[in-house]
From Swiss-Prot:
It is found in: Cell membrane. The keyword Membrane applies. Induction: Repressed by GbsR. This is Choline-binding protein.
Amino acid sequence: MKRKYLKLMIGLALAATLTLSGCSLPGLSAAADQTIKIGAQSMSESEIIASMLGQLIEHHTDLKTTTIKNLGSNAVQQQALMNGEIDIAATRYTGDALTGTLRMEPEKDPDKALALTQREFKKRYDLKWYDSYGFDNTYAFTVSKELADQYHLETVSDVKKWAPQLKLGVDNYWMKLKGNGYQDFTKTYGMTFGGTYPMQIGLVYDAVKSGKMDIVLAYSTDGRIKSYGLKMLKDDKQFFPPYDCSPVVPEKVLKEHPELEGIIKKMLGKIDTATMQELNYEVDGNLKEPSVVAKEYLEKHRYFES
């Protein structure tokens, strides 16, 4: 009798355990499904934008977000999207997408580049490439304002007359780049410099500020351009392809969470290159956390009120 009673109690306990397990696992899975994973590259710009998206999503919906940081390259982001490791790529650039992911020729017209990228990403990968946030993080030849005033420099072509006596500081990578690198640049603009000095991209800003370099190749959204009083020269021959920045989201994710569409669209076309420079400098120059810079921007522009 005792054995039968013991077996009955064990059976009831097992049944209760299985019932509880069956109830709790779907709950855990559902909770996980309610967390949107936002991918950010290993640079301030990407972390700021990712944080803006995350804060807006959490404020305006019941969804939770987490940021997957340090996605080092265009290829890594693409793979993470395709594998479902991230739900949103916060910052993708048309120039990288066309020549890198899509293996196509660069398109110099910004509108055509965007339209082509959007079409091909939908067709090949079922990914939605949104319109731009409003800024273009491309290469930009940059000089001190003093040098610009001295030689009356407004465009890259204006440099040609003085190039043989100028020292140029450039990114190591750009010297070897095919299609849009140094060799093709000299052919397009018909100029060579008195000296060309490859270095890490982060060093070019101090090099031109200190006068060690006369002209450098910079990233157009870097905050040091403004804080150091530097001047970007217009690429009047459109040598560099556009690198307009957009978020990218799998269509599957948008079907599962249609509320994301309206949130993402709130940010499109709102952040120009000068604004992105300022935001980047808050992180790189004033050493603020990207999440703090993102929140301050969103509060200032009343994103949480609408």
